[in-house]
């Protein structure tokens, strides 16, 4: 149980650092989801299978996050849904999406193949393991974004940067000419995701106006869980799954830092980092919150640009 073990490694110092935030309203992610869904319904082809899948993912994880936040707010001293419960529903979603995409893609030449950055001629066919990969990316990214949501503006800012990158990638893979020139898989209908990702960016920027330091509202799990799931499924649909490790590098590092912290603590009873996720480690070293956030933004932007460059390499 990663989250519960992680909480045991936290210290009172973290509570002191964030003591002034205890009265800031949360569940602002509801507004993000509403903005994304309304924009998508207005401007996208809602009968497009990929649009339906990303909307389904957003709503499923949004409901899961809503109940988690609601329990935290209404039941004192509660940490919300158990980690096992959340993981069960996340895996359930991943399985459903994975099976749908597997049967949708299996008759398409590039359908269940994995595109390897830098090696455009190497595209191993995952076969039935494709379903497990889909589950891994949706569950992993959902939790990674959730773990990153610990500093004012950090998670939503990195999400906006990732959304911008996927907007361009979705447009490219949805066009025969561009995808042929760059030698990336052409995915008919995936161009609609560029509109969806644009809605994600717009909603994210609107929320960031109120979430940047000092935050006037937090997104809560109702925002972070679906945003992570969206990034995961978009990467899968546009057949650039491994690019998520560049585009979402901050999220990946945050999640890995927690896993390492837990594993090392269980084995040695000592902390690898002063506190996990890693953004708290830098806070403990004396970095101001805004400096941590801005430096993470810079890294996220550089890695997103690098991911776009790989399309031409």
What is each model feature region?
Residues 6-24, 79-86, 284:
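Juxtamembrane helix-capping/reentrant segments at transmembrane boundaries
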Residues 1-3, 63-68:
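Alpha-helical transmembrane segments within multi-pass membrane transporters and channels
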Residues 21-33, 84-93, 289-299:
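Select subsegments of transmembrane alpha-helices in polytopic membrane proteins
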Residues 9-17, 111-126:
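Interfacial loop/helix-cap signal at membrane boundaries in integral membrane proteins
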Residues 5-9, 34-63, 97-114, 129-134, ...:
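Alpha-helical transmembrane segments
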Residues 72-82, 116-124, 288:
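Membrane interface segments of multi-pass transport proteins and intramembrane proteases
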Residues 81-92, 152-158:
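Alpha-helical transmembrane segments and their helix-start/interface "positive-inside/aromatic belt" motifs
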Residues 22, 47-55, 74-89:
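Membrane-interfacial loop-to-helix junctions in multi-pass inner-membrane proteins
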């Amino acid at each position: 149980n990663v989250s519960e073990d992680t909480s045991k490694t936290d210290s009172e110092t973290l509570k002191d650092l964030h003591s002034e935030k205890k009265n800031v309203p949360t569940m602002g992610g509801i507004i993000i989801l509403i903005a994304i869904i309304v924009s998508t319904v207005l401007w996208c082809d809602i009968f497009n299978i990929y649009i339906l899948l990303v909307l389904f993912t957003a709503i499923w994880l949004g409901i899961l996050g809503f109940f988690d936040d609601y329990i935290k707010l209404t039941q004192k001293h509660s940490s919300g849904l158990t980690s096992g419960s959340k993981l069960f529903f996340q895996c359930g979603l991943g399985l459903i999406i994975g099976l749908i995409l597997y049967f949708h893609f299996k008759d398409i030449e590039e359908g269940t193949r994995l595109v390897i950055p830098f090696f455009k001629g190497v595209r191993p066919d995952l076969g039935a393991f494709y379903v497990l990969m889909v589950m891994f990316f949706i569950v992993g990214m959902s939790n990674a974004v959730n773990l990153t949501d610990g500093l004012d503006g950090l998670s939503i800012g990195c999400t906006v940067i990732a959304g911008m990158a996927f907007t361009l990638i979705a447009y490219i893979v949805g066009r025969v000419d561009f995808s042929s020139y760059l030698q990336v898989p052409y995915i008919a209908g995936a161009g609609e995701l560029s509109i969806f990702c644009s809605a994600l960016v717009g909603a994210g920027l609107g929320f960031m106006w109120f979430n940047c330091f000092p935050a006037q509202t937090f997104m809560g799990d109702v925002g972070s869980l679906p945003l992570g799931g969206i990034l995961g499924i978009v990467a899968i649909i546009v057949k650039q799954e491994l690019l998520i490790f560049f585009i979402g590098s901050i999220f990946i590092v945050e999640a890995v830092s927690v896993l390492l912290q837990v594993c090392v603590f269980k084995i040695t009873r000592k902390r690898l980092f002063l506190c996990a996720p890693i953004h708290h480690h830098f806070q403990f070293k004396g970095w101001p919150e805004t400096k941590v956030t801005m430096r993470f933004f810079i890294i996220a932007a550089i890695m997103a640009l690098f991911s776009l460059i790989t399309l031409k390499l």
